[in-house]
Swiss-Prot record:
PROSITE patterns registered for this protein in UniProt: COX2, COX2_CUA, COX2_TM
Subcellular location, record wording: Mitochondrion inner membrane
Catalytic activity: 4 Fe(II)-[cytochrome c] + O2 + 8 H(+)(in) = 4 Fe(III)-[cytochrome c] + 2 H2O + 4 H(+)(out)
Major localization class: mitochondrion
EC number: 7.1.1.9
Known cofactor(s): Cu cation
Mitochondrial matrix side: 49-62
Source organism phylogeny: Eukaryota, Metazoa, Ecdysozoa, Arthropoda, Hexapoda
Name of the protein: Cytochrome c oxidase subunit 2
Amino acid sequence: MNTWMNFNLQNSNSPLMEQLMFFHNHSMLIILLITILVGYIMSSLLYNKLYNRYLLESQNVEIIWTILPAFMLIFIALPSLRLLYLLDDSNSPLISLKAIGHQWYWSYEYTDFNNISFDSYMIPSNELNLNSFRLLDVDNRIILPINSQIRILITATDVLHSWTIPSLGIKIDATPGRLNQSNFMMNRPGLYFGQCSEICGANHSFMPIVIESILINSFIKWISSNS
């Protein structure tokens, strides 16, 4: 989860988020090099007294300032395209979970099993325990196994919402009348927190999401006890 004064991305807990962080670092390095180069050229033009009265056009200069940005864009575009394909890749999911956005709570359905569905509301501040997180904890958590491919189907019943778990690299719009899909896998057990990331009304800030990832044996026991 996010912490106080954290200006970086959250720790990655899925292979997809790990790749997104690699791409972020890669693109930031290229942006930094571009900033240094442009800053050096601008400062050189401002502070030196060199000039050329006879330089009206230069084929070489035009070739350089056309090819150099093109190469930089290619180095950014190729990893980006690979990530876009990974985001849409559906690789034989083990479990399908359906998330439905409402004003202002989420409801979930485990479509592979019978009669497993529930609503998930934020726990009010006056009902929190000492070890709970304000505006992030819910009364019913999503229970999912680790190291398993999960397919998430997302829709809404009223207005636009957005189902987001930053540490897993997931952000999918929940649109009324439309079913969106994504895939993810969690590397380690724990709690993963997220929130609705689309302004959806007065209580938009009070739509948290909590995933509890557990071992596959514990997940089977949970399914058996709730079926």
